[in-house]
Each structure stands twice: as structure tokens, then as C-alpha cells.
Amino acid sequence: GGTTTKYRHHSLERVFAEIDWVAEKKIKYVFNADSNFGMHRRDMDIAKKLVETKKKFNYPEKFRTCWGKNTSEQIFKIASLLNLHDLEKGVTLARQTNSEEALKNVKRDNIKLEAYSELEINFNKLNIPVYAEMIMGLPGETYDSWVDGLTSLIDTSVNNQIFIYQAEIYPNTEMNEPQYKKKHGIKSTRIKLNEIHCSPREQEWLKEYQDIITETACMDVEDWKKRNLFSVLLMVMHS
């Protein structure tokens, strides 16, 4: 992914105006596109605005976000505030994968499982739902490392649920570069966008698609199918 890409914040005035618009349109569920919510000082102001707006207008009913990877005291405070006012949809403790090889290939790192488990315990003490997010199909991930990683996650954690997502290819990312694909044997399949928390699109609306990884140097299509079956069963049984 574009892990080193620079970004700029929208102004707080614009963010607050969008929250007011959500309440005006009586939108029940809001998904925050910020992939590291809670890492910046202004995020507490945004959380307070959400609480204030819900108190006044009863909307939005629920707010979901992707929390910063290095969970800090501020994230605990923000999550507690949202949970207190029944806005919280749960705290993400994202790992993507437990495979060191896959992490190296996508230029990511993880906190240790012991520290991860401690964070989960702290959130559970506050009755804040916790869920883990994993990504299936990253380059360098074998079937055995995938299964072993999920098993270790369950054995050492107390998360309420595990969400497993397909690895996707996005424009303007290293994973979409021809030389990167060749190096890791990446092949993708284009499918219709799998949307949740929304009504079916009207036929005349623009159709959207996503490119998911279905082959790598460590995974052929049959292996991908096998991983999918295992992952779906795990999510059903562990939820």
C-alpha cells in the first residue's frame, strides 16, 4: 500500500460541517475513512463533536473508524467517550498478518502478540468491543503461515471477533507496480465492489469494482480457495 504517502487534513470546520450534515440527513451509520483515527490531538475534538451531535439530534447512531496502529492513551480516552454514548462500533486492533515475511514484503510491522493481548484486556475492562483485522493473500504468506498466524491470534487474545479481508490492489501503490507484481508472482481478479451497510445500488448507478489478489508466488488459486474456506469458517465459529 501507499504507507509512505503524505497526506493533509481537512479543516475542523469542514469536518464539523459534515457531521452536522450527517445529522440533518438522519444517517444512522458513519464509517470514518481515516485509517489512523486517534493518533492526532484534534481527533478528540472530532469525537466530542460526534457525541454532541448525537445528543442533540440522535444521529449518527453508530460511528466506526480504523484506529491508529500504535494504540495510545488518547485512543483509550476517545474509544471510552464514544462507547459511553453508544456510538462505538468496536475498536480495531489491526494486525494484517502474523507472517514476518509478508510484513517485510508490504513494509509493515506489528506490535508483539503479548502487548496486543494486553491492549485487548484493557479495552474489555471498559466493555469496549474489540475486533482484530487480518488481510488474506499478502505476498509471502503461505497457507501454513496463514493458519498458524490465525491460531496464534486466537490463542493469545480475547478479541470479540476477527474480520478477514481480501488483499486488494490499489492505483498509485507499490503493490500495483509491474516489477513488484512480477517479483512476488501477484495476479489479481476484478470483482464487483462488495458493499456493506447500504442499500443495493440502482441499476443506472455507476458500478464500482475491486481488484483482489488471487495468486502469489506462495499461493495458487486452489490455495486461495482453501484459505477462503478456512477463514470463513473461523469467522463464523469465533464470532
Which functions belong to the PLM regions below?
Residues 26, 54, 127, 157-161, ...:
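A generic secondary-structure signal for well-formed alpha-helical elements
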